[in-house]
UniProtKB/Swiss-Prot annotation:
Cofactor list: Mg(2+)
Pathway: Pyrimidine metabolism; UMP biosynthesis via salvage pathway; UMP from uracil: step 1/1
Family indicated by similarity: Belongs to the UPRTase family.
Keywords: Allosteric enzyme, Glycosyltransferase, GTP-binding, Magnesium, Nucleotide-binding, Transferase
SUPFAM superfamilies named among the record's database cross-references: PRTase-like (SSF53271)
GO biological process, one term: uracil salvage
Protein name: Uracil phosphoribosyltransferase
Pfam families to which the protein is assigned, alphabetical: UPRTase (PF14681)
GO terms of molecular function: GTP binding; magnesium ion binding; uracil phosphoribosyltransferase activity
Coiled-coil boundaries: none
Length: 209
């Protein structure tokens, strides 16, 4: 079973509390999502592969370590996942970025996939799927399904807020996928929203309804 890690760093929890507030503006919400994603990256990227590289200091030549950035991919689930990309890219700017587009059918609460655009060598990359919310788990499961159909095998899911129902569903569907979240909330309501949650992350990121 993949691990579930709730990142309880004080800075992340402080910013997440502001993010949840109803009166947080679109501008502030967007900035906070970016900042939290970057802060989460410290733990999410802890086990990145390293490679030897020869460099020259002012004193001598030496072999040191660097991240094998060409073997990473960040894949946001559109549209809300876009808000988390830059925060992680600021830490690993050489990573490639793919996109998986989905929307939720408001009657069935099931995700519908409308776009998959990935690096050609996605099967050779360590992949970080990002989406602010892990609610029912439907979108996350479908995204991982799409990646595995294309040969991907090393996949991590990163979100800001999660529900126990979504975590359970993703773990059961894909037990090899690690989950990183900033908060594990109480439950889902009848409309499939996380409680207490933070509302619709996509609408709050882009100022839509």
């Amino acid at each position: 079973m993949g691990k579930l890690e709730v990142i309880a760093h004080p800075l992340i929890q402080h910013k997440l509390s502001i993010l949840r507030r109803t009166d947080t503006s679109t501008k502030a919400f967007r900035e906070l999502v970016d900042e939290i994603a970057m802060l989460m990256g410290y733990e999410v990227l802890r086990d990145l592969p390293l490679e030897d590289v020869e460099i020259e200091t002012p004193i001598t030549k030496t072999v040191q370590k660097q991240i094998a950035g060409k073997k990473l991919a960040i894949v946001p689930i559109l549209r809300a996942g876009i808000g988390m990309v830059d925060g992680l890219l600021s830490l690993v700017p050489a990573a490639k970025v793919g996109h998986i587009g989905m929307y939720r059918d408001e009657e069935t609460l099931k995700p519908v996939e409308y776009l998959v655009k990935l690096p050609e060598d996605i099967d050779q990359r360590q992949i970080f799927v990002v989406d602010p919310m892990l609610a029912t788990g439907g979108s996350a499961i479908l995204a991982v399904d799409s990646l595995k159909k294309r040969g991907a095998s090393h996949i991590t899911f990163v979100c800001l807020v999660s529900a126990p129902e979504g975590v359970k569903a993703l773990q059961e569907a894909h037990p090899d996928v690690d989950i990183f979240t900033a908060a594990l909330d109480d439950h889902l309501n009848d409309h499939g929203y996380i409680v207490p949650g933070l509302g619709d992350a996509g609408d709050r990121l882009f100022g839509t309804k």
